[in-house]
């Protein structure tokens, strides 16, 4: 909470609100009661010097940080709330106060298909490591069919792409990057952006 207060200039913005309420109370404004009631519903007053907040958290911690932001008048309707891959945590669909919420992730349809296959094979839900290893095994198989062992080093040095079951992987300079989709949760719905 202390970090959130610092990045949102909470104390200054809280003081701005108190000063504005006091100014209106002492004014001759005919609508001052209405204005004061509206201001009293807020926690702070004043602008913020950022457009988005990246929340590097999951589960209840994500919800806690997001709620703390709400109490400093950082609202997802005015600022982008972006987080890490939430693995399609369905509980976030019901957290309408922190929506819209944006995050990168693997393709949802491919993920759902994989979960069904995994459950049918092992009678339990897959963990995240099994998901990534699923395509890694596919990559190794693909490479073994299309290359001899001596050329593997060359394959990882030049630019290549591999389409796995759960996504597309780019290979370049001995690094593998997984192309992710970007999703938004808004009004209790999961929306694929790209």
Model feature map: region roles:
Residues 35-38:
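A small/polar active-site loop signature that marks catalytic segments
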Residues 123-134, 141-190:
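Segments of small-molecule ligand-sensing domains
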């Amino acid at each position: 909470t202390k970090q959130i207060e610092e990045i949102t200039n909470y104390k200054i913005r809280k003081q701005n609100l108190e000063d504005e309420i006091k100014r209106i109370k002492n004014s001759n404004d005919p609508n001052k009661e209405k204005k004061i009631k509206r201001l009293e519903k807020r926690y702070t007053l004043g602008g913020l010097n950022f457009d988005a907040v990246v929340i590097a958290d999951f589960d209840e911690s994500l919800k806690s940080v997001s709620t703390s932001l709400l109490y400093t008048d950082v609202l997802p309707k005015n600022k982008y709330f972006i987080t890490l891959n939430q693995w399609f945590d369905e509980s976030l669909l019901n957290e309408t106060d922190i929506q819209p919420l944006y995050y990168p992730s693997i393709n949802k349809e491919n993920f759902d298909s994989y979960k069904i296959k995994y459950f049918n094979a092992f009678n339990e839900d897959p963990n995240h490591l099994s998901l990534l290893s699923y395509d890694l095994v596919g990559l190794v198989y693909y490479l073994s069919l299309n290359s001899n062992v001596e050329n593997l080093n060359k394959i990882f040095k030049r630019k290549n792409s591999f389409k796995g079951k759960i996504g597309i992987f780019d290979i370049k300079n001995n690094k593998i990057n997984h192309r992710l989709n970007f999703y938004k949760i808004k009004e209790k719905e999961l929306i694929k952006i790209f």
